């Protein structure tokens, strides 16, 4: 049952991320805005979920499943690599610092909101 909960959640999270990315593709920018926003909202939600201390099945479905499928560490690092190799260093460092710096802050804010 646990595997099914996680798998269904991951599918829902991935579909949500895909749809949001499609919607945001019309924004012409070198800055990967949709990945940035997806990862920040996912960080906040996971922080909230952790602070809420919900039941294990709910946490597995939402945290490991939905938010695991929704957020994307691999896309973040792929985009960072592309920016670096295209010599877009100012965007690279801004994206890197904002994602990790704000990611920690919004996760902490989510945690405290969930208490």
UniProtKB/Swiss-Prot annotation:
It is found in: Cell membrane. Pfam families: CRCB. GO terms for biological process: cellular detoxification of fluoride. Keywords: Cell membrane, Ion channel, Ion transport, Membrane, Metal-binding, Sodium, Transmembrane, Transmembrane helix, Transport. It catalyses: fluoride(in) = fluoride(out). Na(+) is not transported, but it plays an essential structural role and its presence is essential for fluoride channel function. It is a multi-pass membrane protein. GO terms for cellular component: plasma membrane. GO terms for molecular function: fluoride channel activity; metal ion binding. The chain crosses the membrane at residues 1-21, 31-51, 57-77, 91-111. Disulfide bonds: none annotated. Na(+) binds at residues 68, 71. InterPro entries: FluC. Belongs to the fluoride channel Fluc/FEX (TC 1.A.43) family. Fluoride-specific ion channel. Important for reducing fluoride concentration in the cell, thus reducing its toxicity. HAMAP family: FluC (MF_00454). This is Fluoride-specific ion channel FluC 2. It comes from Latilactobacillus sakei subsp. sakei (strain 23K) (Lactobacillus sakei subsp. sakei).
């Amino acid at each position: 049952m646990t595997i099914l909960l996680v798998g269904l959640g991951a599918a829902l999270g991935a579909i949500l991320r895909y749809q949001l990315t499609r919607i945001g593709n019309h924004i012409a920018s070198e800055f990967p805005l949709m990945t940035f926003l997806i990862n920040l909202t996912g960080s906040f939600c996971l922080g909230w979920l952790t602070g809420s201390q919900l039941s294990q099945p709910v946490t597995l479905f939402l945290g490991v499943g939905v938010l695991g499928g929704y957020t994307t560490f691999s896309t973040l690092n792929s985009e960072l690599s592309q920016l670096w190799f295209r010599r877009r260093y100012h965007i690279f460092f801004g994206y890197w610092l904002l994602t990790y710096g704000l990611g920690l802050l919004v996760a902490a804010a989510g945690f405290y909101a969930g208490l």
